[in-house]
């Protein structure tokens, strides 16, 4: 229990320093208390401490101040009975006498000093002692200021406790006396000192220097390294001689790293850093270790859309392109046939020391099944094979488990109805066919069914030369012309425009099936071996022949008679 101080306190302004006198009663009678007004700071004496701190400033009633106003920060302590303290007068009258404030007294005392410091741009010492929403509280020797989270440091702080309860400088950003708010910055101090250190470091930095730094930020293309007062970029390709898909595979935030300055731009002040440059370059003797044509084994390390990566040795990989995985399935998905960690045999195809690339092949270590097939089934060989697949343009037959041959629709029959015959085949049917071509480079085998029988149109070009007059029978009437059979053995066709030399008679419907006609050979269609005929050319030739033969015998004979006679002779 505390003992209340009985002797009354002689009031005085906070700026005045009087000593107590023995005759306290006499002094009280002569003391002028007119200076004690609301809004002033005066000295008072602590006369009691219980739930509150009781302070006597020399008036009729003593003031009661909450203990919390004496404990604004961890550095502050409660006063003891008898101590003199500065207090702020809020009221001088009331039911409980005057109202005092220790907190306002402290602020009033320090505010002027802080305003002067702020106007000069000087720094003020303080201590971070608490966390609040959006930042921290800072004790500026009794005045509490706000430190926003964005003003704590130049980079995010992982452990805020490391900067708390430490006396350190701050810069005052703003002051509002009416609201009693002060905003400070720790970052501004760091940036200023960092700027000076940055200029000093940039003046000394040289390419080839080896420095230590901290990973400040990680991006898809690399990592930014804090070198103390400046940052440098460690590009993805300069992290390791081995393939790195993302910097986070090797680096982590706040990690300490040793780097080399590989490039410094004097104008932009940009610093490019490298880690791999501190290690042995495996590409220096790569061609000696992995000569082209050498067969080796290695483990599958990673897949890509365009192939698979295989480990050559620690930190070094080679690429097997999708087209080099199998002889039979070009550009196949490597995930369907290989697994991570699988040991595979490969051959070195190419080594590019400039681009740091090694091209490998898995299929080159295996016998090409097309070569094996060609050895046992040369062109002209007749084979039997089951149909594996049917498409719009032909048939694929299975020559082995992983080898197919193709029969194009044009190689199914000598006639021009291969597309129709294609529909009569079904998957699994065994077909007999002949090997037509084997293209090792393109990895293609062409087969044919029609080649099993002689070409019925062989020699047609010799027999039916252009201009030859032939007899034919109409076999079908089409919108675009007539299909005919020439000399009872060869297929022919007469286009609509070749049906007559008269425009109004160029109509297929004017003819009938089985009708016999005479026409001239216009050409041979090589793709179908079909003979293209022309009635128009035949009639024009006959007319010219008649004119030549009968036209000069009698000038009085009319043209109609000449043609009639010529046609009559041609029918004999």
Swiss-Prot record:
InterPro entries noted in UniProt: NA-bd_OB-fold (IPR012340), Ribos_protein_bS1-like (IPR050437), Ribosomal_bS1 (IPR000110), Ribosomal_protein_S1-like (IPR035104), S1_domain (IPR003029)
Ranges for domain S1 motif: 39-103, 121-187, 208-276, 293-363, 380-450, 467-536
GO molecular function list: mRNA binding; structural constituent of ribosome
Keywords: Repeat, Ribonucleoprotein, Ribosomal protein, RNA-binding
Gene3D superfamilies found in the cross-reference section: Nucleic acid-binding proteins
Pfam short name (any one): S1
A cellular component term, taken from the record's GO annotations: cytosolic small ribosomal subunit
Keyword Iron found: no
Listed name of the protein: Small ribosomal subunit protein bS1
Similarity section: Belongs to the bacterial ribosomal protein bS1 family.
A single GO BP: translation
Protein function: Binds mRNA; thus facilitating recognition of the initiation point. It is needed to translate mRNA with a short Shine-Dalgarno (SD) purine-rich sequence.
């Amino acid at each position: 229990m505390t003992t209340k101080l009985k002797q009354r306190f002689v009031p005085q302004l906070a700026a005045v320093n009087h000593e107590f006198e023995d005759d306290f009663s006499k002094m009280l009678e002569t003391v002028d208390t007119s200076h004690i007004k609301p809004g002033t700071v005066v000295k008072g004496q602590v006369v009691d401490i219980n739930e509150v701190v009781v302070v006597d400033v020399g008036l009729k009633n003593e003031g009661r101040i909450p203990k919390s106003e004496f404990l604004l920060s961890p550095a502050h302590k409660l006063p003891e009975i008898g101590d003199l303290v500065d207090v702020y007068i809020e009221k001088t009258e009331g039911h409980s006498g005057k109202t005092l404030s220790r907190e306002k007294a402290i602020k009033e005392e320090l505010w002027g000093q802080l305003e002067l410091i702020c106007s000069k741009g000087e720094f003020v010492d303080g201590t971070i002692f608490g966390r609040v929403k959006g930042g921290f509280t800072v004790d500026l020797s009794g005045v509490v200021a706000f430190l926003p989270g964005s003003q704590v440091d130049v980079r995010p702080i992982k452990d805020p406790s490391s900067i708390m309860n430490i006396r350190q400088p701050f810069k005052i950003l703003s002051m509002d006396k009416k609201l009693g708010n002060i905003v400070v910055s720790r970052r501004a101090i760091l940036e200023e000192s960092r700027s000076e250190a940055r200029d000093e470091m940039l003046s000394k930095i040289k390419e080839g220097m080896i420095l230590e730094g901290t990973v400040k930020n990680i991006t898809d293309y690399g990592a930014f390294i804090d070198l103390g007062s400046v940052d440098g970029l460690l590009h993805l390709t300069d992290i390791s001689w081995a393939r790195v898909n993302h910097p986070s595979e090797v680096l982590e935030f706040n990690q300490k790293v040793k780097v080399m300055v590989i490039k410094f731009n004097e104008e932009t002040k940009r610093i490019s850093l490298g880690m791999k440059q501190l290690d042995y370059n495996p590409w220096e003797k790569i061609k000696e270790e992995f000569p082209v044509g050498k067969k080796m084994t290695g483990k599958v390390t990673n897949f890509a859309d365009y192939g698979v990566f295989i480990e050559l040795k620690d930190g070094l990989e080679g690429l097997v392109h999708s087209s080099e995985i199998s002889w039979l399935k070009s550009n196949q998905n490597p995930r369907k046939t290989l697994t991570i960690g699988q040991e595979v045999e490969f051959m070195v195809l190419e080594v590019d020391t400039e681009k740091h690339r090694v091209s490998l092949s898995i299929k080159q270590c295996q016998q090409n099944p097309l070569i094996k097939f060609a050895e046992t089934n040369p062109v002209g060989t007749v084979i039997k094979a089951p149909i594996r697949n049917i498409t719009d343009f032909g048939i694929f037959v299975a020559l082995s488990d992983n080898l197919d041959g193709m029969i194009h629709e044009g190689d199914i029959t000598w006639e021009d109805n291969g597309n129709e015959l294609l529909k009569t085949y079904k998957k699994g049917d065994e077909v007999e066919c002949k090997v037509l071509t084997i293209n090792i480079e393109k990895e293609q085998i062409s087969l044919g069914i029609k080649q099993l029988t002689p070409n019925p149109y062989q020699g047609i070009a010799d027999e039916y030369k252009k201009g030859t007059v032939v007899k034919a029978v109409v076999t079908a009437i089409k919108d675009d012309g007539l299909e005919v059979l020439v000399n009872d053995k060869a297929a022919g066709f007469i286009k609509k425009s070749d049906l007559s030399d008269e425009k109004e008679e160029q109509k297929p419907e004017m003819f009938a099936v089985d009708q016999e006609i005479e026409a001239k050979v216009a050409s041979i269609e090589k793709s179908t071996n079909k003979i293209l005929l022309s009635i128009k050319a035949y009639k024009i030739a006959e007319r010219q022949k008649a004119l030549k033969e009968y036209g000069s015998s009698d000038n009085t004979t009319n043209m109609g008679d000449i043609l009639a006679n010529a046609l009559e002779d041609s029918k004999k």
